[in-house]
């Protein structure tokens, strides 16, 4: 019997409107490994175009990984101290008040998480197109939104994306046990796929040579320098995105004061190793010129770098990589669906979102919140605008990340007597460095993409009238399912 099933059986005396602590350490690590998505297969090319040498690309991967690890060490203390559904929403609410917590939750629910689901589901559909034709496009439109031109289209790929979102929404609304099983299976499959590509590149590649790492090439698109290295770091940080989601299911992790920190730290160390070794394999298998000209904004019709590397040891390598792409994307999709829906659930329980979303199903999962998130993501997936809109929230994502990091310092002073079974390693230096670098990334985004950053702030600010409404009509949903008077 799985740990999830066992926990569910052991909790019949608990109130049916209380979450079940059913996620084991293994399940929690699998959720952290949701981070391993399609980015590791794609990002080497744009990073190479920015910094112009293999060593700098690898260094950027390592630096981004260490930054993410510093963040994980910081989040670990917060997650262990406040193991509740909602994660970052809870941390920001406790440190800075309802408004800041709400604006994070609003952004997560309405754009960041749902946009991520739309993006990943369309990625799965595009990878599926390598095996099945999904070329039909029936409607195309252009919209002008927040100073940007948004291209809208409806076709076979969008419908498949919607079907995929509905499938994984239904799986996770069915129960925590099923969602956790799917996550573990996807994690094992995608790690196995990466191992196949890495071993094939190192042991069987017809073009493999360590000399590929010794030939720096001048970047063709962006000048090198500190700014360029920062841009490369930002590119790789998207591949690390998602490690912070585990605390969102803090209310369902067994022994959270131990397992949340351990899962975050062990999981991130594993991700750093996987990303570094995988990119090292790409540079070993391919001349740097091939990496430079792989699929990216500059070379839209080229093969992804992972496909090129696989092609050096097997003629059907690109098809193999497409399959692994799809598995990795499915794992990310399931993980986002499972974890992020706990944010609107927590907000609704606090009376700061639609109250029905704060009610659990008879299987003790926030099924209504899961379906709300999924259906909203379907609308974004149908529109096809997710990739352009989410570009506008890079600034906001890092703004909230910096705020969460700083909340550790605030809560150390605000709640000095709170139980802390785990304290952030390297405090205050490591959390401070994390906050400083996150703030630098906020400023970097602001100066590099001012229009998109401003648009991101506008999208967040749209939540303000909703906050006023929810505050005016606020009635909290208690853990026993009763609505406060």
Description of each model-found segment:
Residues 23-41, 160-168, 201-204, 218-274, ...:
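Hydrophobic, membrane-embedded alpha-helices of multi-pass small-molecule transporters
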Residues 153-154, 356-367, 401-452, 477:
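C-terminal membrane-solvent junction of multi-pass transporters and transport-like membrane proteins
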Residues 90-91, 97, 129-144, 216-220, ...:
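TM-loop-TM module centered on a large, flexible mid-protein loop between adjacent transmembrane helices
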Residues 55, 391-392, 396-397, 426-485:
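A generic transmembrane alpha-helix motif of multi-pass inner-membrane proteins
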Residues 46-49, 69-165, 170, 326-346, ...:
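Hydrophobic transmembrane alpha-helices that form the core helical bundles
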Residues 126-135, 188-217, 237, 280-288, ...:
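Hydrophobic alpha-helical segments and their helix-loop junctions in multi-pass secondary transporters
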Residues 156-210, 241, 264-268, 393-403, ...:
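Membrane-interface loop-to-helix entry segments
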Residues 1-54, 68-73, 82-85, 417, ...:
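Membrane-interface "cap" regions at the ends of multi-pass membrane proteins
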């Amino acid at each position: 019997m799985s740990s999830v099933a066992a926990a569910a059986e052991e909790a019949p005396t608990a109130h049916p409107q209380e979450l079940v602590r059913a996620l084991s350490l293994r399940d929690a690590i699998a959720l952290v490994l949701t981070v391993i998505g399609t980015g590791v297969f794609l990002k080497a090319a744009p990073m190479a175009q920015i910094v112009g040498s293999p060593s700098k690309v690898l260094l950027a991967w390592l630096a981004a990984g260490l930054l993410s690890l510093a963040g994980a060490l910081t989040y670990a203390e917060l997650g262990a101290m406040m193991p509740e559904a909602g994660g970052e929403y809870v941390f920001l609410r406790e440190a800075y008040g309802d408004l800041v917590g709400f604006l994070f939750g609003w952004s997560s629910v309405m754009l960041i998480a749902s946009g991520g689901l739309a993006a990943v589901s369309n990625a799965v559909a595009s990878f599926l197109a390598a095996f099945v034709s999904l070329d039909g496009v029936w409607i195309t439109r252009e919209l002008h939104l927040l100073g940007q031109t948004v291209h809208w289209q409806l076709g076979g790929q969008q419908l498949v994306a919607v079907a995929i979102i509905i499938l994984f929404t239904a799986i996770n609304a069915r129960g925590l046990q099923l969602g956790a099983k799917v996550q573990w299976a996807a994690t094992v499959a995608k790690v196995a796929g990466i191992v196949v590509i890495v071993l094939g590149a190192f042991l069987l590649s017809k073009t493999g040579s360590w000399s590929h790492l010794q030939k720096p090439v001048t970047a063709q698109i962006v000048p090198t320098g500190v700014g360029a290295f920062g841009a490369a770091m930002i590119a790789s940080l998207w591949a690390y995105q998602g490690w912070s989601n585990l605390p969102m299911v803090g209310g369902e992790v067994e022994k959270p004061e131990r397992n949340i920190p351990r899962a975050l730290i062990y999981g991130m160390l594993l991700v750093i190793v996987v990303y570094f070794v995988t990119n090292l394999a790409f540079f070993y298998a391919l001349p740097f010129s091939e990496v430079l000209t792989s699929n990216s904004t500059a070379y839209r019709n080229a093969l992804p770098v992972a496909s090129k590397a696989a092609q050096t040891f097997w003629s059907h390598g690109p098809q193999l990589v497409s399959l692994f792409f799809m598995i990795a994307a499915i794992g990310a999709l399931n993980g986002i669906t499972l974890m992020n829906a706990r944010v609107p659930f927590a907000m609704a329980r606090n009376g700061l979102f639609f109250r029905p979303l704060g009610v659990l199903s008879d299987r003790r999962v926030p099924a209504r919140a899961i379906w709300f998130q999924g259906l909203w993501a379907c609308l974004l997936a149908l529109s096809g605008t997710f990739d352009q809109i989410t570009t506008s929230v890079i600034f906001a994502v890092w703004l909230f990340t910096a705020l969460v990091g700083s909340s550790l310092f605030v809560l150390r002073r605000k709640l000095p007597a709170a139980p802390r079974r785990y304290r952030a390693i390297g405090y205050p230096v490591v959390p401070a460095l994390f906050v400083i670098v996150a703030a630098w990334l906020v400023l970097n985004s602001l100066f590099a993409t001012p229009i998109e950053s401003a648009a991101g702030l506008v999208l967040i600010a749209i939540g303000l009238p909703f906050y006023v409404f929810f505050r005016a009509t606020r009635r909290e949903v208690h853990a026993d399912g009763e609505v406060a008077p």
